[in-house]
Each structure stands twice: as C-alpha cells, then as structure tokens.
Amino acid sequence: TQSQTALMHRFNGIPFTTMSSPDLLKSLDAFDAREDDVLLVSYPKSGTHWLAQIIMQIYTPKVTLTSPIEFGDISRVEELNNLSSKRIIPTHLDYSMLPSNFKVKQCKAFYIIRNPKDIAVSMFHYYRDNPNLPTIDSWTIFLELFLRGDVVCGSWFDHFLSWEEHKNDRNILFLFYEDMKKDLPKVVKKMSVFLGVNISDSEIKEICEKSSFTEMKSNVEKENSDPNHTVCALTSNRKLIFRKGSVGDWKNHFTPKENKMFEEMFNKKMELSELAKRIIY
C-alpha cells in the first residue's frame, strides 16, 4: 500500500521506518564507539525500556541514556559524539549492522530475549496504535508478515541468531524477559556483576520496586512525552510503549492452527540454537 511505502524503507534488506534515515544507517559503520559505552540490544517489544530503567539505577554516577543509535537523521552522530558522560545506547540492529567499533572495543552489551509469540502479539498492537507504522488489517495478516520477516527490524529469528553466534563473547550478557518477570532481584544482581558495579541487597530491592511495570507505566503517564527519552526507534510517544508487559498473552490471540504454524517454523529455524531451548512460553 501507499502508506506502507511512505512509512518504511529497506536497508541491507531489513525493513526500517522512515524515522531511521538511510543517511544515518549508511554512516553508522564509521561510528566512534567509546570503551565504556554500554549497549542495550533487543528486537522490538522485548523489554528494552525495562532493561534501560534498571541500568540507569544500577549506575549512580551520571550516565546518559540515549535514544537508539539508528533513530533520527545524520545529525544524530554528532549529537552522540558531543555527550560527555557515559553513554547507555539502545539499539534494535542485528549483529552484522552494529558499528564495528563497538566490536573492536569490546563494549559491554545486554541482549534481551523474549518469547517471540508474545513479541508478535505486542508488536501487532503497537502497529495498530503507532502512526509511524503501516496499517495492518488483522492479527492473521500481521502474523504472516511477522513470520516472513516483513515487519520493522526484519525477522525475529534472524535477529536472534545473529546475536546468538556471539553467546560466548565475554562482553555480551544474554537475559531472558521471562526470568526478569520471575525473579527480578536475581537478574539485577547478575547485571550489576556484569557491569562491575557493587550494589547492596537493599539497593537491589529498591531498584526492583522502581522498575515494576506498573510504576514505569504510571511514570510515563505523568511525564510529558519527551522524544529524547525514548529508547524505541519506532516512536517518540512513550505512552505507546507500555501495554501489558505480561508473559503468555499470545494464548489470547493465537488459534491452534496459528500456534502449530509458528511452532513448526520456530523448531525448524531454531533447531541448532542453544538459547532458544531456554525460551519459556
């Protein structure tokens, strides 16, 4: 459709919204990473905001949470270069598109994994509510697009596998959304150890309280939507970002037939993946 064409473009074969300009995407490979940069990597709707909220609290000295590296136009690069404080940089890029400087300098990175069925549902609602994304007529149509990788940021499977190839890199920590839901203090502790920051049990407790979904959602509703606060490359309206944050919502959307189709594709694509075996439905 016309709207589809106007709102999206492809770069390296991956669909991006026009909020990621081709000029910016082309320039990324020359991006100057710093050794103390921390990356928050995810496929959309995997819990990036939650992760960002926690990391900002683990670091008590001044750090800057930037908007995603691929969000905006070419002026973005200079903006990031001008930041004097430590940078926490979110991104939805797959591993091959990540600026090589981050790899050379072995910057620390978190990769958050969420059950892709829940991601598909969350993304479907997001497409419906977000004017920067094409209109999708129905859940059934959206699911087909999702499985084909014809959605923003491309195929979940490819994205996941591109990062999983680096699961033994010491500078990358893989986290599961569902583990965070189940035992957040344990995950926060793991994150702080990875970052080399000492925090007490009472500080962990406080971080978890401030990072509850309800707390984060109500904070966003109180704030004005400041585009500089977004860690989403698809919108600057933060109210669109928090919906349910639950585990297993896919069961309210998938028909048995759709579930079977999804499972077949998942099993085929993820046959050799170790991390995929740990995904909780």
Model region roles, listed by residue range:
Residues 1-175, 225-281:
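PAPS-dependent sulfotransferase catalytic domain
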Residues 147, 196-240:
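Catalytic lobes of large eukaryotic enzymes
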Residues 48-61, 175-199, 207, 215, ...:
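PAPS/PAP-binding and catalytic site of the sulfotransferase fold
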Residues 95, 116, 179, 211-214:
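Residue-level detector of flexible, active-site-proximal loop/helix-junction positions
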Residues 155-158, 186, 202:
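Generic recognition of short, well-ordered alpha-helical interface segments
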